[in-house]
Structures are given as structure tokens and as C-alpha cells.
Amino acid sequence: TVIDTDDELIAYLKNKLQRFVFLDEHVALPIKVEYGTPKTLGKDRLAAVVGANYLRPGKNLLVIDAGTAITYEVIEAPGIFLGGNISPGMTTRFRALNHFTKKLPLVTEEDDIPLIGRSTETAIQAGVVNGIVYEMDGYIDELKVKYPDLLVFLTGGHSFYFERRLKNSIFADINLVLTGLNRILEYNVED
């Protein structure tokens, strides 16, 4: 997530704390970042990448974070963050269909999603959910062509909803961002 920071608060914390690590584009990281615009890179995306690389070092990795947006982050062995893709998340897609059309209702996900919708509501659910599943599996399949040994992490608020729907093997880790934040902190305070 990219947010504005309170410079006054940061100055106060730096003054009051013995050690203060602020996650920005200048912080030391245990991975190499080849992302073209590090200043605009979401801190959650960066932390998830660091977390995945910490859990499976030296591997080719794809991190899928399924939340408000769905992000796809590629880490090439031995720990090079190449970049990724961003698409609308499930709730965002449901809301967009409702907001940008005149008559489509706002629906939410259900446990049982048909392949073919039999009503407007189930057609929206099937379109959104199955579309995301095909998108995720599509990215995984394409990356496995280049990286046959690819390991995939799935995290984010909707990760458990999608983990059982994907045809590809994945590691679901709801705490991947927190793992990455902790690793960044450790990396910056090691003596």
C-alpha cells in the first residue's frame, strides 16, 4: 500500500526511539529490487516479497496477494525482485460491476460458485470468482514455462477463499506480509 507519511511523527519517533526503521525506498533489504519505480512500490508488496524469499530462499517465487487488489510479484533466484502485476480484487470487481452499470446488483462471494450462472447474481459471482481463478492459474502456468521449479505463495484477505479453487499447487500464508516486515526489521538491526 502506498500512503502519505507524517514527517512530524517520523521525526518524533526517530528522536525518541533507540532504533527506528522506516520502510521506504532507501531502507536496506535482504533482496535485490529491480523494480523501476521503488518510490511508488507498495510497502505491503515489498514486505510480502521479502517474506516469501525468507521462507524459501534461493527459489524462483511468485507471490499472489488477494485483497482489495490482487498483486502478482515475481522473485527470481537467488532473491531478485523483478516486479509484478496489479489487478482488481474480488470485492473491487463486485463493486465495480454494481457501480459502473445501471442495473447489476451488488453481490458477494459464496462458497459454491457455478461454472455457468443461472441468474444475474450467480452470473456475476461465476464471472468474478472464476475469472480470478483463471487469472491466477494463468499467471502461474505462464511463469512455470520460464521457471519450471516455481513456488507460489498465496496471501491476503481472500487467500483462503481461493487456495482451494486453484489447480496449481500453492503455499497459503496469511501472515506473509508480517513475516516480511519482521525480516526487514531484523535485517536492519543485525550487528
Region annotations inferred by a language model:
Residues 1-61, 78-191:
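Nucleotide/phosphate-binding catalytic cleft detector across ATP-hydrolyzing
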Residues 70-75:
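Short beta-strand scaffold segments in enzyme catalytic cores
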